[in-house]
C-alpha cells in the first residue's frame, strides 16, 4: 500500500492525522537533520500500521516534506 505523507519536523508532540484524501500529515519531534526525522517517521508508521520497520520504505521525497511511503502489509 502506498501513502502520501506530509511531514512536519520539529513539532512539540508526535501526531499522525489522516486527511480526507487518504494522505497523512505526520508531526515529528526530530529535526530534519542526518535522517533523524525519516527514522522517526518510519518508527511511527510501523507502530500505526502494526508492521515491522523493515516493511516501510520511503519511495520518494527522502529530503522533502512531501513523501511517498510504501507499506508492505503482507506479513
UniProtKB/Swiss-Prot annotation:
Q: What Gene3D superfamilies does the database record attribute to this sequence?
A: YggU-like (3.30.1200.10)
Recorded GO CC terms: cytoplasm
Region of interest (Disordered), ranges: 1-32
The lineage's top-level taxon is: Bacteria
Q: Which SUPFAM superfamilies match?
A: YggU-like
Instruction: Quote the InterPro entries the UniProt record gives.
Output: DUF167 (IPR003746), YggU-like_sf (IPR036591)
Family assignment from sequence similarity: Belongs to the UPF0235 family.
* PANTHER family, sorted: UPF0235 PROTEIN C15ORF40
Instruction: Please report the name of this protein according to its UniProt entry.
Output: UPF0235 protein Ava_3894
Which organism does this record belong to? Trichormus variabilis (strain ATCC 29413 / PCC 7937)
Amino acid at each position: 500500500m502506498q501513502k502520501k505523507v506530509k511531514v512536519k519536523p520539529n513539532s512539540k508532540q508526535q501526531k499522525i492525522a489522516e486527511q480526507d484524501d487518504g494522505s497523512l500529515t505526520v508531526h515529528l519531534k526530530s529535526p530534519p537533520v542526518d535522517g533523524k526525522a525519516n527514522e522517526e517517521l518510519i518508527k511511527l508508521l510501523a507502530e500505526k500500521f502494526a508492521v515491522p520497520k523493515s516493511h516501510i520504505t520511503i519511495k520518494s521525497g527522502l529530503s522533502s516534506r512531501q513523501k511517498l511511503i510504501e507499506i508492505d502489509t503482507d506479513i
